[in-house]
Amino acid sequence: MQKYNLQPGTGFIKRRVNLAGQDPIYQQIWDECYNPKTGALFFAEHCCYTRKNGIVKYNPRDYQKEMLFLMNNHQSVVSLIGRQMGKTVTSCCYILWYAMAFSEKDILITSFGEKSAVENMSKIKSMYEYCPDFLKIPIIKNNETSLVFSNGTRVYCRPTTPKAPRGLSPAIIYCDEFAFVGGNSSAQKSLENQQEFYAAISPALSATHGKLFITSTPVSETDLFYRLWAGAINKTDDNNLDLPKDYALSKDGVLYDDQNLFHTKEDAVAFIETLPEDEKKKYAPIAIEPEGNNGFASIFADWTKDPEKTIEWKSKELKRSGAEFFAREYECLSGETVVSVMIDGKCADMKLGDLYTKLSQNNS
């Protein structure tokens, strides 16, 4: 993918920039940006800005490129990713690209509370403002909980409740921090709340063949998020046979810089053969995990995948927030996760939450 240095945008626009009579490079960039198969990564690398001690250019990490790959190539994706790892930013980036790339679509963003849902909408609006002006689809309606583009695509944000999809035919539903839905209730009530929401969105997605993206850090091993995650990482069919691998292309040894997905190695090789001779040698087919038994693709990323989070950072964060919080929020381990520990010279299995309580009592 050729790299461009594009001027940041100047805010919301009501009329599309006319590319006629301008340098042909602008039309070339437009075509690359809104290519249905490969445009999402181009958009992320060239057009997205985010707030991080000011407005900074979004530079997707390897796991974020994988997120974009999965969202663009699969109907259902569940992501177990640690705190402050950019999972929401990456999802919002994809949603903004999709909203401008495709016409007459409904997109629903949900989170465990209205405030969180509105915050995610504000991320999309900020990205739109700084997107290069000549790549923007004009916005004709803008309020706190909705955006309407001139191409007919509508984006809404709502709390994660069974009423959320009402009145919509969603092409995408994005559920952020899904494990925290019903978090102030008992474990059983939280599960019921999550199941009611899932039951409400399933018919709508089935009717539109829409996409479902779920991201979260973990809470427990009894909620619906955990069950969806467990089904997604189960790579065997109902007869307990291994599901066949999918294939992606590495380019110059880097995976996910190419965003094409293939279901057989033969298809991947055939695609490489269509490339110019000087390009063929740069590519190689790589086996990757398929969707799980429940039809969800999955991605896991803890703090170690972020090059900005060092051992020194971990040490400071452990002192600041404690072991249980760190394990759940950054290592993606819930309080229900069972770990093996040495107690009085004997190996024992213990829930992480119980271990933290025991350590706290010993230190008091």
Report residues per predicted region.
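Phosphate/NTP-binding elements of NTP-utilizing enzymes
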Residues: 1-336, 341-344, 349-350, 358-364
